[in-house]
């Protein structure tokens, strides 16, 4: 899939960050609170990471008052998990326990597709049937990755209250933001031009042609584009929250 960015992706990240701002406000509604913000989508690694990035940019615009317990550290994201990166539950639990002990809360951004191989392996080892759709894909709604993450970490980090929330329905019903409106306009203008010229293809910025906006050949189009976890902005985000540099997951 050579298309640089799908229409609506930036809006979804914006809206996911807005959703998170309300949900993470619950971090001090109880002692030792674990919040799992689940970003819906089978292969939404980029969206999960971009949502965390936009949320943290929003935090940069806030004013804090540590004297009454209003701190950026407590409002921050403490873990980001995507399908393309290896998941070290034990290592992360050890790190997050220290965060919980220090702040009294832990907030995680989890892609719905993260941890699926581990969940499937655990279900099969227990002799359970893994629910799949007609195409053989694991039914994410049935195995509930967000709840699985919460279950994995809750005891290990001694959480006393757990809150799992999905932002997908909120995000995907939103109107396009200005970035996406501009992107849509540029694509529709070119789409009309190419259609009148009888040139077939999918309109998008072609990453393999220097991000040129063009009609990309149909035979080059495919789904399930993996998120590039080696990008500097993503590695910087993880480093900033104290999470280890990502390693590629075996399934990717």
Task: Walk through the language-model features, giving the residues of each.
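Accessory alpha-helical/coil subdomains and C-terminal extensions
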Residues: 7-160
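Conserved small/polar residues in nucleotide/adenosyl-binding loops
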Residues: 2
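C-terminal non-catalytic interaction/assembly regions of soluble proteins
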Residues: 115-252
């Amino acid at each position: 899939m050579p298309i640089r960015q799908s229409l609506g992706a930036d809006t979804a990240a914006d809206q996911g960050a807005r959703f998170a701002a309300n949900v993470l406000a619950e971090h001090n509604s109880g002692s030792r609170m674990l919040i799992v913000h689940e970003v819906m989508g089978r292969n939404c690694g980029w969206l999960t990471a971009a949502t965390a990035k936009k949320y943290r940019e929003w935090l940069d615009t806030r004013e804090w008052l540590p004297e009454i317990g209003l701190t950026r550290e407590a409002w921050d994201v403490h873990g980001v998990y995507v399908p393309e990166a290896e998941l070290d539950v034990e290592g992360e639990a050890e790190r997050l326990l220290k965060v919980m002990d220090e702040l009294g809360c832990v907030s995680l951004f989890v892609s719905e597709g993260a941890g699926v191989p581990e969940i499937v392996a655990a279900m099969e080892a227990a002799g359970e049937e893994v629910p799949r759709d007609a195409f053989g894909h694991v039914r994410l709604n049935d195995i509930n990755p967000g709840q699985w993450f919460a279950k994995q970490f809750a005891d290990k980090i001694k959480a006393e209250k757990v809150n799992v929330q999905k932002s997908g329905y909120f995000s995907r019903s939103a109107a396009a933001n200005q970035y996406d409106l501009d992107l849509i306009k540029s694509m529709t203008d070119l789409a009309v031009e190419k259609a009148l010229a009888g040139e077939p293809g999918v309109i998008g910025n072609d990453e393999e042609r220097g991000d040129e906006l063009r009609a990309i050949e149909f035979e080059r189009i495919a789904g399930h584009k993996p998120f590039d976890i080696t990008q500097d902005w993503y590695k910087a985000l993880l480093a900033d929250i104290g999470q280890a540099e990502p390693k590629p997951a075996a399934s990717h």
